[in-house]
A protein has these predicted regions:
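Residues forming the flavin
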Residues: 1-5, 9-562
């Protein structure tokens, strides 16, 4: 809980405003000096200045000094987006002895200079209005307090593939207890189907070593043939019920979702109707059992970059080249054709593409709109493909037709887990992170993280890297004795609450609940301050702190002042 300075409770606002040049990002369009001078005359403003980079350490020190010298009890910074820098400035206020919620940030970069580059005079006037609005709102800001909750230093990892195994081991090595839940009867997931890597990696050996390490680690409890039935609680204190082979109730502080994905099951190219039409995964097993291959045709982007699955599965091209090289090294007389629209051997994998060329693997490019035609020709398979180089059709009769099947989400399992935990899914059924750049392994719900194929298609190395990242983020919570919750959250006026439960239906974070008085109440540990419930409440009984109705009115009326 914050210790508030005496001036936080004073009704008279003493506002300090800092306008940022952001190098030339803002000042090349907006007349920053003119904005700063204009602000000085506004009611409640006792200090105004402009700085080159307000986020620099020198300016942070300057802000702390000005707060103390001029007894500021509100601070407004006009600069870039609060999404990236609000926390920095709030911490500066806290270090200066001012409640961090007595801070307001105005975006005059993304919302002004960047979108009005050809209208500097109008951009300057708009910047004045935006800052004026923030000053009007800041006069009504009130200090907020946080409350502490204890943290259970235990993790639940859902999914026992290589991503889940990696996360569990990482956390266990850091000294945390881990519950590892897997719906299948063995750990390992999709990695069991890879016999070797593009660079010769022994994935079966690697996987066996990791499974043995997990089984021997006393900090990891393994629950096979088990699924999650229910999840309650919030960051630091979750309660999860398991069903299946190890039905029980678990207490833990964080959750890592590593549920994996599946190989696309083709309904095209005679797959399932001809024994010689197989996927790359099946070819890996065939490679161990076969010495002569004859003619092999591989078709890329099967189940990827299509109308149903518009994304690239990232691994298919590399897998095709890996297996093509393996075939040619085992049977140099084999004829291998790879039919492709775009070949994506990203990063160093281009080296293996050149190696395949050297081994006389033939690559045939076909147009996006003209997929190869595959049909039975007696007992054989007939493939007709348009070669864009010669602009004519080529007919091949392979001994093996290998389909580079993509990676698809396990939609039903993901949907059920998403509903249980209020987690977002994208249009393809994959779990979605909170922000692709700022929070790439976090869900919007605090204390819940994701990694591996549950997030999106990626190769094994990327799955391992993301699993380590998720474990690292989880450890930032598990390593604490307590967490502070509250601040910018919604609050409900019980006297006005009609118990209509609209807020319970609207909240995607499961924060509202019905208390023992029959009224709705907000769990501050779950609330993310999105304001959906406040906007939806028909009784107007809900207020979002730091964005109350009176503060909104002050913001808008100040912007519209002449």
């Amino acid at each position: 809980v914050y210790t508030l300075s005496l001036h936080d409770a004073l009704p008279i606002s003493r506002i300090g405003v800092f306008v940022c040049h952001c190098g030339i990002n803002i000042s090349s369009v907006v007349d920053v000096q003119k904005v700063s001078q204009y602000i000085e005359a506004l009611p409640g403003v006792v200090h105004s200045e402009h700085t080159i980079y307000t986020c620099s350490q020198d300016t942070q020190k300057r802000i702390r000094e000005v707060i103390r010298e001029k007894d500021l009890n509100r601070v407004v910074v006009a600069s870039c987006t609060p999404r990236t820098h609000e926390g920095l400035f709030q911490e500066t206020l806290r270090e200066a002895g001012v409640n961090k919620y007595l801070f307001e940030m105005t975006d005059i970069r993304e919302q002004c200079s960047w979108v009005h580059q050809k209208e500097p005079e109008l951009a300057t006037e708009k910047a004045k209005s935006l800052v004026r609005g923030s000053i009007g709102k800041s006069r009504l800001l009130e200090p907020l307090t946080l409350k502490k909750i204890s943290v259970n230093p235990t993790a639940l990892v859902i999914g026992g593939g290589i991503s889940g195994i990696t996360s569990a081991l990482s956390l266990a090595r850091q000294g945390f207890k881990v519950h590892l839940v897997e719906k299948q009867q063995r750990l390992g997931g999709n990695l069991w189907f890879l016999k070797h890597g593009l660079d010769g990696e022994d994935w079966p050996g690697y996987l066996n070593d990791k499974i043995r390490e997990v089984e021997e680690n006393e900090r990891i409890d393994i629950y096979l043939d088990t699924v999650v039935k229910n999840v309650q609680g919030s960051v630091g204190n979750f309660t999860t019920q398991l069903t299946g082979g190890h039905a029980r109730e678990l207490q833990h502080g964080v959750i890592i979702v590593a549920t994996g994905a599946e190989e696309y099951q083709p309904g095209e190219f005679l797959y399932g109707n001809h024994p010689r039409s197989i996927t790359q995964r099946q070819l890996e097993t065939t490679l161990e059992e076969t010495t002569r291959f004859g003619t092999v045709v591989m078709i890329q982007c099967v189940g990827s970059r299509s109308q149903e699955h518009a994304y690239c599965s990232r691994v298919c091209c590399s897998e095709a080249i890996k297996n093509a090289i393996a075939i040619k090294e085992k049977d140099p007389s084999a004829n291998v054709y790879i039919l492709y629209r775009d070949l994506r051997t990203y990063t160093y994998r281009e080296v293996f593409y050149r190696r395949a060329r050297e081994l006389d693997v033939r690559f045939i490019h076909f147009p996006d709109e003209l997929y190869p035609k595959v049909e039975e020709s007696g007992e054989r398979i007939r493939v007709q493909v348009r070669d864009t180089v010669i602009n004519d059709d080529i007919v091949l009769e392979p001994d093996w037709l290998v389909l580079s099947a993509g990676i698809v989400a396990n939609r039903e399992d993901n949907r059920q887990l998403a509903e249980l935990m209020k987690l977002p899914l994208d249009e393809h059924g994959n779990f979605m992170e909170a922000h692709v750049k700022l929070r790439p392994v976090d869900f919007a719900s605090e204390g819940v993280f994701l990694c591996g194929l549950a997030h999106s298609p990626k190769n094994t190395e990327e799955n391992i890297t993301q699993a380590l990242a998720a474990a690292g983020r989880a450890a930032t919570i598990l390593s604490r004795d307590s967490l502070e919750v509250g601040g910018v959250v919604s609050v409900i006026d019980e006297d006005n609450c009609a118990s209509c439960l609209t807020c319970l239906r609207e909240c995607v974070f499961d924060a509202p609940f019905v208390n023992n008085k029959g009224k709705a109440e907000i769990d501050p540990a779950k609330c993310q301050g999105c304001g959906n419930c406040a906007a939806a409440c028909p009784a107007q009984a809900i207020q979002l702190l730091t964005f109350t109705k009176s503060q909104q009115n002050a913001l808008y009326s100040s912007i519209l002042e002449p």
